[in-house]
Amino acid sequence: MSQFDVAIMDYWSTSGRSFLHRAGPAAKVLMAAGFVAAVVTTRNVALLAAIYVTCVALLAVARVPPLKVMGIASYPAFFALLFVISEWDGTWQTPALIFGRALAAATSLVTLLATTPYPRVFGLLSRFLPHIVGEALFLTYKSVFMLLDMAGNLVTATRVRSGLQLRHPLTNLRNLSLATGKLLIHAFDRSEREYDIMVVRGYRGQIAAPERIWQGLASDALPVALGAAALAAAIIIRWNP
C-alpha cells in the first residue's frame, strides 16, 4: 500500500454521502471487528467468501470503487503466499483458507477506512485505549505507508541510475547504505512537517474523540447486525460443523 492509496481512501471516507458513510464510527468499528473475529474463528471457506462479497457489495452501494479497493486489499495475499508454501498439505482447502482469511480480513478493514475518516477511527479508539497507545496507532498508520512509499521511490531511483547491479554486490551494499541514510533524513524531515501540519489543524498532544460515536438506530443497525451475524455464523459453523 502506497501513500497514494492512503490518500485516496481518505478522500473516499470524507467525500462519501452513502448510508455507510453516515453510520457512526462505533457501528462501523464493531462491524469490522465482527468480520475480523469471524475470519479468525472460522475454517469455512464459504463463510470467508461471503464476508468478502459482503464488503465488496457494501463498497459498491457506498459508491466507493470496489475494484480499486479490492486491489488495495489484495496486498496481504502476497504475504499469505509464504504461508501457503510452508503450510500446504496437498489439498485446495488449505491455500483457499489462507488466502480467504487474508483477503476477507484486509477487505473488512479497508471497508472501514474507506468509509470512515481515520481521525474519527483513532479518536474512537483513544476513548478505550491508554493515551499513548492511541497516539502511537494514529502516527504509525500515517508514517509506515509514507516510509514504504519513500523507500520504494529510492530503490527505483537507485536502479534507474544503475546503482544496483548483480555483478557488483559490494557496490550494491554501498549504494543501499547511502539510500538508507537518505531515507532516514527524509523521514525526519517528513515527520517534522507532518507534526507542523497536525498542529496547524488543531493537534494539541491528543487526538480529539468524535463527539458522536453513534448516529442513531436507523444508520447504525445494519453495520452492527452484519458484524454480529458474521461472528455468530462463524461460531455456529466452528462448533457445529
Model feature map: region roles:
Residues 28, 47-48, 67-69, 134-136:
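Alpha-helical transmembrane segments and their helix-entry boundary regions
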Residues 41-42, 59-64, 115-117, 235-237:
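Structural signal for the C-terminal ends of transmembrane alpha-helices
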Residues 70-170:
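Juxtamembrane/interface alpha-helical elements of multi-pass membrane proteins
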